[in-house]
Amino acid sequence: MYTIVETETFKKQADKFWTTEERLECFTQIASDPFIGDVILKSGGFRKVRWSRAGMGKRGGVHLIYFNVLEDGLIVMSYFYAKNEQENILASELQKLKG
């Protein structure tokens, strides 16, 4: 099992949409299968996973951007956005995450 940490940006975004229970359910799934998300091309290893929200329909889901640091079992939850607000992470946002 991996350890999950959230960036401040991720926390602020996720708090707008998720309950504590939804957050824990998602994190448990990602920690048990850190390869669940698709690798984002030219991102240096960031992954994107789509997560549905109960009762919200297809457009009510969210996208999570995370980085899996395999050497030490750490997963960094980096970015969060609602599918109905944004389809993909912008290149400028991804560049900020990469540092």
Tell where the protein language model's regions lie, with residue ranges.
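Short polar/acidic secondary-structure junctions
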Residues: 54-56, 67-70
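Short strand-loop junctions, especially beta-strand C-caps/beta-turns
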Residues: 9, 52, 80-83
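A short, surface-exposed loop/turn module that caps and links secondary-structure elements
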Residues: 28-58
